Amino acid sequence: AQGLDVMEVMYDMLIQGDGKELFYQPLGGYQSYSLDAQKKLLEHPNVLFGLSDGGAHCGVIADAGMPTFIMTHWGRDRTRGDKLSLEFIVKSLTSSTAEAFGMYDRGYLKEGKIADINIIDFDAMRLHRPEAIFDLPAGGRRLVQKPEGYELTIKAGEIIFDNGVHTGALPGKLVRRSNEKREVALNS
């Protein structure tokens, strides 16, 4: 409508946010403008929730917000298609993942288990827009996406985050998988 080339419009949009604007383009899985195929994948018994490339692409991918996105979009906000139950989401983010990595001593709120606990305000949960920060060695860039709605994060009985602010407590330690052996059968 402005008589501008698409690239000109994109560049104009990028400079509006003091150089901090980003464009997002899904690389796949959204060709039909529906997330129904992703829901089917997420529900498959051999699929684990999680994303990581060990930080190799932290300047172009902000995937640390994945748990918050799963809870807010799939568990609360989705309007075009069925949601996932919150119980399924929590199990998938906790015990299912722990067991897949042989960590049978965690992932449950049970006596004798190691429990890291997030106290959340589910209705207040949301993700901020991704932003680039330059705090890596030699001024390297990484993308971060801050969440809201996490009231407390407790590790080993100590509060490590209070309303999104780190308390300075560092009770964590190196995690190794359990020596416990279990038979694993893939579901088809």
Spans of features found by a protein language model:
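Short, low-complexity, polar/charged sequence segments that are solvent-exposed and flexible
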Residues: 67-71, 136-141, 172-174, 180-182
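Intein/HINT protein-splicing elements and their conserved insertion hotspots or analogous self-processing inserts
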Residues: 161-188
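Short, positively charged
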Residues: 85-88, 126-133, 137, 182, ...
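Aromatic- and Gly/Pro-rich donor/ligand-binding loops
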Residues: 25
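C-terminal cap of metal-dependent C-N hydrolases
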Residues: 40-47, 52, 119-171
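Short C-terminal domain-edge/linker segments immediately following a structured domain
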Residues: 79-83, 147-156, 183-186
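His/Asp/Glu-enriched, well-ordered alpha-helical/loop segment
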Residues: 1-16, 22, 33-126
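Residue-level marker of regulatory loop/turn positions in helix-turn-helix DNA-binding domains and
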Residues: 30
